[in-house]
């Protein structure tokens, strides 16, 4: 007779529970460690933050440079404008508007694109392709939202349902660019971003670029989608990671750079076929160019993710070899070796850029 205890202990379900328990214990350990910092260390860190605030702050004035990101316990308080604050159409839009309340009511239920069109059809200020700009003030940033895409038709409407109202409350000028990969090659998220950048710049003199995964839903409208003096990592606390930063150099999900910054780092690498590694390479490029990375304070950077488990996409096994040569490749692989042929169509809420990507379109010379 089979020992029932042996069968139970070897069950994949039990193994999964054990792994989940160990991860939760590790996460709790991290939280305990962070909360055990001494008062002296906190005071010292606040002094250093204050000394560096002017040099490293972005236009949002509420973020912190990565090299000072040791704890969020002692962050400066962000003040938002009162409800009765008056601003004028010929003045720059404030960055901390009364309309930005903080937590967003997240609705992850599936919705068709037709329903999204109907939802925003009564807003005449949204132009073809999803272009919008405020009329009651001058937007501080002209923001191109670039979304890499393949077979996520149920995710895009959910994202737009949340992002459009949020960006309108933030009084940013914006438009959406959905960059869709077709063909048989593995998904190349980074190359799609490069294509989206090139196409977006043909439409308008954008000054801020947001690189946004379609399955990341922001939980706070105070996560201001403008750019700054440093590249910005917006999605710092993702629910599937228990709202913890997976590792210090994590730069995935949602990030933002000015056009000047993006050109200086030569964009994303084109050589990452399959998922994984391209965000780490972007981090390296940012550091190699002499930039730090800013992040939202507190819980402002919280996001919910739509589960998908990289359906149909393969993991890029060669990413570590490429990452070891990030610095050598940076000037050879990116915007400057990009070639593509795009098919452009317009939706009421976004511009669709369809490309069939192959490695031959971004060949790299020897380094």
What residue spans do the PLM features occupy?
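Hydrophobic targeting segments
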Residues: 141-147, 163, 175-178, 196
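N- and C-terminal low-complexity/disordered segments
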Residues: 1-57, 184, 217
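Short, acidic, metal-binding catalytic loop of nucleotide-sugar glycosyltransferases
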Residues: 134-140, 152, 159-173
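A short, compositionally biased domain-edge/stem linker segment
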Residues: 123-135
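C-terminal catalytic/acceptor-binding lobe
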Residues: 16, 20, 40-46, 58-93, ...
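A conserved acidic beta->alpha catalytic loop
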Residues: 139, 151-155, 180-186, 214-217
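Acidic, Ser/Thr-rich intrinsically disordered and amphipathic helical segments
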Residues: 13-20, 92, 115, 144, ...
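Conserved catalytic core of nucleotide-sugar-dependent glycosyltransferases
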Residues: 184, 188-192, 197-199, 208-212, ...
């Amino acid at each position: 007779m089979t020992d029932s205890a042996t069968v139970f202990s070897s069950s994949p379900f039990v193994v999964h529970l054990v792994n989940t328990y160990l991860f939760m214990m590790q996460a709790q350990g991290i939280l305990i460690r962070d909360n055990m910092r001494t008062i002296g260390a906190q005071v010292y860190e606040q002094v250093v933050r204050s000394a560096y605030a002017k040099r490293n702050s972005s236009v949002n004035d509420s973020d912190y440079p990565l090299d000072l990101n040791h704890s969020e316990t002692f962050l400066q308080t962000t003040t938002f404008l009162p409800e009765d604050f008056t601003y004028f159409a010929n003045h720059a839009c404030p960055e901390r508007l009364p309309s930005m309340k903080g937590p967003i009511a997240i609705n992850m239920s599936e919705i068709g694109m037709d329903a999204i069109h109907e939802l925003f059809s009564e807003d005449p200020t949204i132009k073809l392709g999803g272009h919008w700009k405020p009329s009651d003030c001058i937007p501080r940033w002209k923001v191109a939202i670039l979304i890499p895409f393949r077979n996520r038709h149920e995710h895009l409407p959910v994202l737009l349902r949340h992002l459009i109202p949020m960006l309108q409350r933030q009084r940013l000028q914006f438009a959406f660019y959905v960059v869709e990969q077709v063909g048989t090659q593995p998904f190349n998220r980074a190359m799609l971003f490069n294509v989206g950048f090139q196409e977006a710049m043909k439409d308008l003199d954008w000054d801020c670029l947001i690189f946004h995964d379609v399955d990341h839903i922001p939980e706070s409208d105070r996560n201001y989608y403008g750019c700054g003096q440093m590249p910005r990592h917006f999605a710092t606390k993702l629910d599937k990671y228990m709202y913890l930063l997976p590792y210090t150099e994590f730069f995935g999900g949602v990030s933002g750079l000015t056009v000047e910054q993006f050109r200086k780092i030569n964009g994303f690498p084109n050589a990452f076929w399959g998922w994984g590694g391209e965000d780490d390479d972007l981090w390296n490029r940012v550091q190699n160019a002499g930039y730090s990375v800013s992040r939202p304070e507190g819980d402002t950077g919280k996001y919910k993710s739509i589960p998908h488990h990289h359906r149909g996409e393969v993991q890029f096994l060669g990413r570590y070899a490429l990452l070891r040569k990030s610095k050598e490749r940076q000037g050879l692989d990116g915007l400057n070796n990009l070639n593509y042929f795009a098919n452009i169509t317009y939706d009421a809420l976004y511009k669709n850029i369809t490309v069939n990507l192959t490695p031959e379109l971004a060949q790299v010379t020897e380094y």
